[in-house]
Amino acid sequence: MFSFGRARSQGRQNRSMSLGGLDYADPKKKNNYLGKILLTASLTALCIFMLKQSPTFNTPSVFSRHEPGVTHVLVTGGAGYIGSHAALRLLKESYRVTIVDNLSRGNLAAVRILQELFPEPGRLQFIYADLGDAKAVNKIFTENAFDAVMHFAAVAYVGESTQFPLKYYHNITSNTLVVLETMAAHGVKTLIYSSTCATYGEPDIMPITEETPQVPINPYGKAKKMAEDIILDFSKNSDMAVMILRYFNVIGSDPEGRLGEAPRPELREHGRISGACFDAARGIMPGLQIKGTDYKTADGTCVRDYIDVTDLVDAHVKALQKAKPRKVGIYNVGTGKGSSVKEFVEACKKATGVEIKIDYLPRRAGDYAEVYSDPSKIRKELNWTAKHTNLKESLETAWRWQKLHRNGYGLTTSSVSVY
């Protein structure tokens, strides 16, 4: 950068003279000044010319074009707990991955780890964006050639949804509409949608099949069902391949210890039971709160189907591989067996080796007594079966990551490439 300021030691005879509010500069100084401007302009023009001659100047990013044999997957919410594990699995399977996340719940450091694991050009890119911004989403689709979308991005806490229902309808239902409209506009033909067993509500008959009536009882489940309805209505007159995965309670982490669950501290009261157990075991919280002991179950606490995140992302990859144009697949993703909250806590005590203090509290709004899946359809049609079905072992895997990451990922935006 050129400096056009005068030195302080300059003589008075070379200074501008002011008269009547006008400056009359020394002609020699004026010529020198103009010469510098011309030199700068010439150098700039030369640089631009040379840059344009570079073979890479007009070469589009590999992410912006389709390539034979390469499947480019947009993973929304890919900086989050489940989304990052899905991105890891896709990258291991040689997919090209673009992560889009607004980082309201996700962790940039998870993206950095993925970038370090797969540094080769054209493997992974991260785009900071909010799916509620339709213009930003359209720009992303315009600049990238996606073959499929895995839509994970969503707020996902039952308790929080009862406190802030409008937030959930905006974030889940409205944002899914934006994604679907943009996919249609840009000819992206495959959607794998991350849904939830919360769309079923509290069925009278267990286990839950895909034919079980959907009667959600909280805004989270209702918002997800609305999003499903939008997708299903659109698919009736579209050649899009659609897979909807309704999964149950997610636990565990990457068996190799690269990724884990690191929710924001302010969301602890709404978080998963595994996170609450680990917080109590590490002394972050004084104990574990069990909300509700008067449900109509064997021990009075809620019964849930706990699915390991490794099995869950395996189901997503199989769904992607099996997706067919003009077809909609709807699948429950669970183990097929339920465990009570008390049983879960006992497994957590064994996994951590800590005698966790338990406080029993009244029920949490929007919860239901018993939910577990019948996974026979996904087993038959996608050849998928949960392999990590031992609660204690899944919790031990997650606990190892927690012990090594006492502050979560503990990294900032300066540590990751953001586009």
UniProtKB/Swiss-Prot annotation:
Enzyme class: isomerase
Transmembrane segments: 33-51
Organism: Arabidopsis thaliana (Mouse-ear cress)
Region (Disordered): 1-21
Record-annotated active site: 220 (proton acceptor)
Annotated membrane topology: Single-pass type II membrane protein
Protein name as it appears in the record: UDP-arabinose 4-epimerase 1
Residues that hold NAD(+) according to the record: 72-103
Keywords of the record: Carbohydrate metabolism, Golgi apparatus, Isomerase, Membrane, NAD, Signal-anchor, Transmembrane, Transmembrane helix
GO cellular component labels: Golgi apparatus; Golgi cisterna membrane; Golgi trans cisterna
PANTHER family hit by this protein: UDP-ARABINOSE 4-EPIMERASE 1, UDP-GLUCOSE 4-EPIMERASE
Pfam families: GDP_Man_Dehyd
Enzymatic reactions: UDP-beta-L-arabinopyranose = UDP-alpha-D-xylose
Keyword Membrane: yes
